[in-house]
């Protein structure tokens, strides 16, 4: 048989305080009741002996008497309550003061005695003369009466402070409006300057030179950016030199065959679509699907035309092309300098001077006779000596083709030097009597001789020694 479950409810144990009251006198208390009620547990002992050297700031930690430790508790400062100041919202009116004398009656009459009206028909009026007269007091002074009015004392003080927020304040306009043009006349308006205080700040010009046609954005950036690097000579780029000059003009002929129906621009990026099986006219351009626009670079050997190509060597199932990049370049041949025959700018001399070993075919021929006396004169010129033959030609010589003098003394100038013969010839050289160019003795400019450029050295002082003079 299944045993019936015990439904006995366990009673709650009495609290430690209740057990302490009954078992303390009889001495039957459990060992944990007395220390718990008297505050003598292990935790209380730790806090009790530890609070001797540690101050917890009056937080009430522990089971002490609550005296605040050695220093005790510090009372909070108290302030004397003061009466709040009442500020009236509206100005107060002065009180109405009614003067009441000591002999006045306490009964206030609503109607004066002279205002009683007698009913009935009025009878004859009798005038009884009075034995006692009355005094009439008049004032001669015509000054108006001055009434003292008490001023209203108001203790309310109202102050207004205004602060300007520059974020929500419009700036002052300090420049005049632009001039207007109407019916062919130019109208200028006066300068409009506000009274607001302003500060003169030096302004800098950010854009120096700009072209209105080339401005695209509202704030163009001045200056030139450095040219971007092409990056044609990397490790992952194949370098291929193209010899065919058609690479410069029509590179499409090297990739595909000519299509007369379509001819695109050759200076832009070219894209090609190949079938599965194709053969390029040039084997270097096999599997090329894109040729970028040309770039001209300067090399040591000359100018180089470069194009960056993209290959499509492999295709995946998803249609993605895989291939490397190729740098095709073609070096342009240098242009040789043309040898141009130069013509002399100076007029030809009257005679052509050659060396002594040759025969001179001059511009003029002089027939020498037996009467001509030739004397040899040695003229020293620097380190070498030169023999100049001075010939005395008689006036009877015929067949002379020397050009005659034009009669004008033309100076060739200081920058043009005439050729002076330096070799020994059998003919007399034509040396002009006057200088070849004008010489200005008095002038503001001069040229120093190279020997004058040397800076003079500073002389070293030498001490003279004498027998009767002491030296230091």
From Swiss-Prot:
Annotated keywords: Capsid protein, Cytoplasmic inwards viral transport, Disulfide bond, DNA-binding, Host endosome, Host Golgi apparatus, Host nucleus, Host-virus interaction, Late protein, Microtubular inwards viral transport, Phosphoprotein, Viral penetration into host nucleus, Virion, Virus entry into host cell
Post-translational modification: Highly phosphorylated.
GO biological process, one term: viral penetration into host nucleus
Signal peptide coordinates: none
Keyword Ligase set for record: no
Single annotated GO MF: DNA binding
Protein localization: Virion; Host nucleus; Host early endosome; Host Golgi apparatus
InterPro entries: Late_L2
One GO CC term, this protein: host cell endosome
Keyword Transit peptide on entry: no
Motif placement: Nuclear localization signal: 1-14, 454-462
Broad class of where this protein is predominantly found: virion
Residue pairs linked by disulfide bridges in the UniProt entry: 23-29
Matches recorded under Pfam families: Late_protein_L2 (PF00513)
Superkingdom of origin: Viruses
Function: Minor protein of the capsid that localizes along the inner surface of the virion, within the central cavities beneath the L1 pentamers. Plays a role in capsid stabilization through interaction with the major capsid protein L1. Once the virion enters the host cell, L2 escorts the genomic DNA into the nucleus by promoting escape from the endosomal compartments and traffic through the host Golgi network.
Subunit structure: Interacts with major capsid protein L1. Interacts with E2; this interaction inhibits E2 transcriptional activity but not the DNA replication function E2. Interacts with host GADD45GIP1. Interacts with host HSPA8; this interaction is required for L2 nuclear translocation. Interacts with host importins KPNB2 and KPNB3. Forms a complex with importin alpha2-beta1 heterodimers via interaction with the importin alpha2 adapter. Interacts with host DYNLT1; this interaction is essential for virus intracellular transport during entry.
Family note: Belongs to the papillomaviridae L2 protein family.
Protein name, UniProt field: Minor capsid protein L2
Organism: Human papillomavirus type 34
